Amino acid sequence: MRALDSYIFKMTQKPIFHKEFFAKMHMFKELEHVDVEDLSMLKLLGLPITKYNNYAFTLETLTTPIMQGKFCIVDIETNGSKPLLNQIIEIGAVMIENGKEVGEFSSLVKTDILPDSIEQLTGITLSELQHAPSLNSVLEGFRLFIKDAVFVAHNVNFDYYFISHNLEEAGFGPLLNRRLDTIDLARKCIEAPKYGLSSLTEHLGIAFENHHRALYDAKATAQVFFKALENIPEEVQSVEQLIAFTKPQNQRKKKEKTNRSTTTGTSL
């Protein structure tokens, strides 16, 4: 996890004074080319920041009810597993607002590199990719689509950090969105023999075609997300409570312990 992510997590624990917040944000290498004192820019990067009062900031997700939240269900296909060496070849996403699907994003990404194994897995051809939009244009479109919605995916860290790395390389700044893993959410809310996407959709009776195509996988993940929400505990009410509930218990305890032992500066 990035140090930047740990600091954003700190904002879920208590509001943070403006002066401390800006001073800290200036320290992160990922934000060295970002005007961190422009809140509209931070929101464009995905941070759901809002004013707590005239002196401090907090996160909108702390008070937004789940059914009024914005969730962007994302899936990517890549020509390899390493962001430093490989590239995204397709992005698919479904936007959920107020409990309903309200939009879709889908695009192939231009490249001249497509291993045979990836072509066989996805059905995407090299010719299709050679005539697709450039990576930078697709990333720009995706950033405008997701805005500050919660980034949701099945095995979320892979998709999140792959996209974030590519955004940074393109000069667009990193992702700062809150994120949620539907694998962890499903494990908390759905009894199933396996929790891979294809296994879950089969178990739940969700129609699932074109596995390993980004938009279709995102749509299937959205259906798993909706099914899981039917079984969340009554006390889980806000978007941030849902994110916290989703995390494995030992991970939550570790974060809470780290936050208590490393809190510095002046916070409300």
Residue ranges and their predicted role:
Residues 1-69:
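N-terminal accessory regions of nucleic-acid-interacting proteins
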Residues 2-4, 11-16, 20, 52, ...:
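Acidic two-metal-ion nuclease catalytic site recognized across multiple nuclease folds
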Residues 35, 87, 214:
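Short, conserved glycine- and acidic-residue-centered signature motifs
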Residues 58-60, 69-164, 169, 176, ...:
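Conserved non-catalytic scaffold segment of RNase H-like nuclease domains
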Residues 78-80, 184, 220:
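Short, glycine/acidic-enriched loop or turn micro-motifs at the edges of active sites
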